[in-house]
Amino acid sequence: MRPIIKLGVPLVAAALALTACGGTSGGNTAGGNTAGGDSKKCDLKIGFFGALTGDAANLGQNIQNGAKLAIDGYNTANADCKVTLESYDSQGDPAQAPALAQKAVDDKSVIGIVGPAFSGESKAADPIFSAAGLVAITPSATNPALAENGWKTFFRVLGNDASQGPAAAKYISDVLKSQKVMVVDDASEYGKGLADIVKSSLGAKVVDTDTVQQKQIDFSPTVTKIRSSGAESVFFGGYYAEAGLLKKQMADAGLKTILVVGDGVKDDGYITAAGKAAAEGTIITCPCLPPDKAGGTFYADFKKAYNAEPATYSAEGFDAAKVILDAIGAGKVTRADVVAYVASYDKPGVTKTLKFDAKGEPSEISVWAYKVEGGKIVPDQEIK
C-alpha cells in the first residue's frame, strides 16, 4: 500500500516566529513573573514529564528532544524573553508520578506540561494537573480512558489505542493473513489496555493469551504457550525492553512466529534487546508519523541540533511544546488562559493540523505500521 499523508504545514522556523515578548496588565508578585497571574510572559517554564532514566528512557528522551527543539526555536526568536524547559524524570513509574506532578504544580512559573509520556503515569499525575488548572499535552500516552475523566487540562496530539488497536488487528488479519493469534500484555495501564482492544478486535482469531510483568527476564512459560497455541502471529502490548527479550527467547526456541507490537516498542532498544537477527520482520504499529514526513524543516532542524534522526514521538513532542509556546506568544500568561487557548487551538503542526475536541482528543488521527528491516525500524504503510 502506498502511504498517504495529508499535511499542510508551514516551515518550522515560521511556526516558531511568535509574538515578541512584552508586558500585559495585571499585578506583580514578590516572586517575579509566574504562571499564576503575572504582568509579563517572561521567565516562564514548560515542563517535560516522562522517563529520562530507567527501562523506557529512550522514549522519554525522544520526546524531550523534540520539545527542546521547539523551545530553542522560540527562544531564538525571543531572546529577551526566553522560556525554560524544566524536566521531571518519572522513570515511567506511576508510583513516582504524583510527587513529581505536585512539584511541577508548586512551581508557579510552570505554565504547561509536555506529557506525561506514558499512560500509567498519566493516570496518576493528570488529576493533580487538572486540580491545579495546569495544562498537560501528551505526545505519547495512548490509553483511551485517559480522556474520559473530565480533566479539562488534558490534551493529546495523537490518536489513542481505540484507533491503534483495531488498526493492529486489521494489519494482522488483512496483511499478515493470520488466522491464529496469541495476545500477550505486560499488565501495565498502556500494555494491557492496548492488548485488550486488539484481542476484542480479532475476536475468534485469538487462540490464547498471556500476561507478563515489566522488568521480567525469563519468558520461557510464554514461549511454551506460543508454541502450543499454534499461533501464526503474536501481538504484544508493552514496552521495548520486555518485547526484545520475548522475541529473543522466541527465536532461541526456534519459533518463526511473527511478532506484532505497539508503539511502546518502537525504539532501537527493542532491536538491541532482541538481537538484530531475531528482531528482523517484527511489525510495529504507532499512531505517529514517520519522522521524515514531518512538515517544514523539522527533520533537518532536528538532525542539525542532535546529530541524529528524529525518533519515536520527537515530532509529537515538538508539536505539544509548540502549542504551549503559541499560547505564551499570544500573551497568555496565566494557567487558566493557557488552558482556554489550547482548548480552542486550531493551527498546523509538523505532524498534523492540531485541533482538540471537548475531551482533549485530536481531530486528525492516523496509524502507521512499521517493520524491522536490516536492523532498522522503517515505515511500512499507513493502516487505513
Model-derived regions: residue spans:
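Extracytoplasmic "Venus flytrap"
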Residues: 36-68, 86-95, 117-119, 184-192, ...
